From Swiss-Prot:
It comes from Rattus norvegicus. The gene is Micall2. Residues 114-181, 311-450, 609-780 are annotated as: Disordered. Interacts with RAB13 (GTP-bound form); competes with RAB8A and is involved in tight junctions assembly. Interacts with RAB8A; competes with RAB13 and is involved in E-cadherin endocytic recycling. Interacts with RAB8B. Interacts (preferentially in opened conformation) with ACTN1 and ACTN4; stimulated by RAB13 activation. Interacts (via calponin-homology (CH) domain) with the filamins FLNA, FLNB and FLNC (via actin-binding domain). PANTHER family: CALPONIN HOMOLOGY DOMAIN-CONTAINING PROTEIN DDB_G0272472-RELATED, MICAL-LIKE PROTEIN 2. This is MICAL-like protein 2. The keyword Lipid biosynthesis does not apply. GO terms for molecular function: actin filament binding; actinin binding; filamin binding; metal ion binding; small GTPase binding. Residues 701-711, 720-737 have a biased composition (Basic and acidic residues).
Amino acid sequence: MAAIKALQEWCRQQCEGYRDVSITNMTTSFRDGLAFCAILHRHRPDLINFNALRKENIYENNKLAFQVAEEQLGIPALLDAEDMVALKIPDRLSILTYVSQYYNYFHGRSPIGGMAGMKRPSSDSTEELSGKKKVPSQPAKLSSPVPTQRLPLSPARTNPVVQRNEGVSERPSPKAAPGTVGSSVSSICGVCGKHVHLVQRHLADGRLYHRSCFRCKQCSSTLHSGAYRATGEPGVFVCTHHSSEAVSVSPKLSNLASRQPGGGIADTRPIGVSQKVLETNGEATPLRARTAAWEHAGGNRAAKGFVQTELTPPATSRVHVGSPAGPRLPMSTVTTTSANSKATTHVTNSSPVGWSSSAQSSTGTSGSRPVVSPSALGAHLSVPQGQAASKGVKTQLNSSTDSSSTAPTPAWTSSSSRTQQAREKFFHNLSPAPAPAPASSSSSHASRVPTVVTAPSGKVSPLVNTSTSKVPSATVVTVPTSKASTVVTAPTSKAPTVVTVPISKAPTVVTAPTSKVSTVVTVPTSKASTVVTAPTSKASTVVTVPTGRGHVVVNTSASKVSGVVDNPAQESSREQALSVLRKALPGLTRAGSQAPSRSSPATSSVLITLPKNEVPPKVPSAKLSHSTTQAFSPTPKMEPTAPLSVGSTSWTSVSLQAGKKSPGISPGIGKTSAVSRPQAEVKGTSGPGPTSQEGQEEGPEGWRARLKPVDKSIPSARALEQKEPVLAEPRAGDTPRKASSSSDSSIHITLTPIQQKRTPCLADSGSSLAAPSPPSRRKKLVVPPTLDVSADWLQPELKKQDDQTRSCKEKTATWGTRESSAILDNDLVSPDEAVTSPVRLHPNYISQEELQRQLQDIERQLDALELRGVELEKRLRAAEGDASEDGLMVDWFRLIHEKQLLLRRESELMYKSKDQCLEERQLDLQGELRRLMEKPEGLKSPQDRKREQELLNQYVNTVNDRSDIVDNLDEDRLREQEEDQMLESMIQNLGLQRKKSKSFLSKIWSSKSKSGQT
């Protein structure tokens, strides 16, 4: 009781002379708030105008005192103005603890909350103040002024008996359940919603928190005094080192997440519509902005934005092919433009891999195809899915291309001149030397699919099925025949290879319906200006071979066995030529028979395959590869390549030169015929060959002469096959191809038009490695046929080039690293320099790791003290008015003192950390400022002068901040010493009085016992 009376006496002395202030106890005497204001005015008259205060304004008086003490003196508000209004008898222990902070501060700084890191708002709104004025003093009619909590009133507020017995406003008594009875709004944590005891209290921004709950919003670490700041959101605090941008975004994200039941943002996309579709539509609006559009569009949104298809698109219109039911494929647009920008083809494809023909036709796009019976295969113009008609043939297509292929288009009249005119106009709009483009297809359903020949164009990618997603574009022109329809595709400038028309249910591209098949082959070369096709009879074959100077159209006719190009050669001559080839190339016969659908000529070649009833002799191909499932891609500098192969079980090939005239082709009739165009990829070089003006040699010597350049480039092609995965990797359009084995046999005939002064480079057009010179390479390739040419003879050169490239990259990386390090050295301080800096060499320097460790130790000690304080608080409230209260109060003050010591140490560490940062900042500013000042005035630019002034201002502010920290630390030490002395003396006096009382009672009892004995 002595300590409580001493504190009460101190308060009475401080409030002496102030009107309407009378300190008779430590409960009701402080209810109106004038006593708190009087103590503050006594020591700091500049903070409060006491004459303006009125006794009846309980809320305003208490609010003013608590606010000024917290903001100006750093004393945390353990009390709340609302509780002072609501309760007739305030909590005695809370008032004792709070007033003791006043006493400690004015005798030496030591508030429970430590430093005043966060300040409460300067004033609340006028509406809240007016509401507080109208609050009656009757506790039964009082409601909480804080609308967000909406907690029920405690019995301490409504029950006068509880008020009288407990005297509690914000603390529950041991006789009542904690957190329910005696709890008020001010005793509830703003984070966890649980009751806050006196020793745990931490008020920030007008809200009460557990010290352990008061954490950073960003890093979730406990906020220390002076090391946190408020944000725009109420009750949200962050560490001082966090950026303001990240803080401002986090509340919005949390609000968005809180709107959904699971804490996440619900997906507002329509059912069945993927996010990829939304992205391909080009919608840049956020998800919430798109919600309204989805509500109006409903399920048709995908059809409106994703598939843009017309029922009757013109031949030159931009065709969008796709379906909303497709499994999440983005819409891709292929735009091909010729060199003179006259012929342009737009193709848009979004069909996924594996779509069936029925699915394509059901989309209502231009991907539908006519169904033609085997008996009446008319010549139709059909635009497959992913293809668009070229503008160059608009006049020839007329109205037949206007339909979207729900019904087949009418057949053309068989007119080769008409086709010739269309081709001339088309190739006139294209570049004069289009690069080669291979084509590929498989054969099946021979009775329902026509034979198709595709012409190459530009940069190529392998021909894929119409049911695949990568569909190239070309112009498709058909020519009627008697028994089978033939489709000829014209090339575009830089478009991928062409997909043929899907007929009936055949998943493959091209087949021949019967053994009596008419075939139209169009093979343009790099300088070809015209392509002419002509209708044929039952078993006739028309092959058009444009050369550098023109084109040759040859009609051949045979019964069921042969089809001949141009002038028919004797059968004996053909056999002699084949025997010469076998003798000249003995080592390649096996490879040619095992690898039918690969071709890698040194120059551009055309591989034409016709069916044959019986298996021909194994003739080695000059440029056949080992697999039909891999693809190469030629360079743009090479000649156009259009290899055509008939799917069969056995394959042979004959390489011919088409630079002179069209040679003979081995005839044959097969069950089915498929058109495939293996991609040729050449690594070697080819020297000048015969020009197109030379006459054709029909004998075996001419064949051998024409085959020599091809023979020389064989090792390079074989070596290229070993490097195929690396060279063919950049081409995403390359797809595996397999030849169908529906026919008995077939034969490959390669037409190789050779032009002078052609030097092909590496197959990879994007490669930066240059090929060796043609003469030296040609000399290396002249080797005996019996010599075993290793497939990896080019590897040393490639390794050397790879090493050069790797070393160049390493040098670049090293240079970039050195440059980066140089930049860092100019702008930042390296770790070695930071260690040797004067700040870190200071004997009192504390590293950040050590600071964090000490702060964690203080945190643990504070947690232990809070547990002790909670138990001691319960005992104090239970022993109110008892003889043991005095001893418990002494323990309480000691516990508060220990907590104050820990908070002091925490404040010192925070001061120390801030001071070290300022010192390092000061050194940096000083160095930069000296460099600017050492520069002559005549050489200084306006930017230098401006920067110098800014640095000078920053330097002065830094020095002032450091001085303030030192002054605050000195003042704190002095106040702490005085406080410790006052507290120790008070405790000692309390202990002496207790000892005296005990000794006095013992003397009385001892005297009584002595008198009784006598």
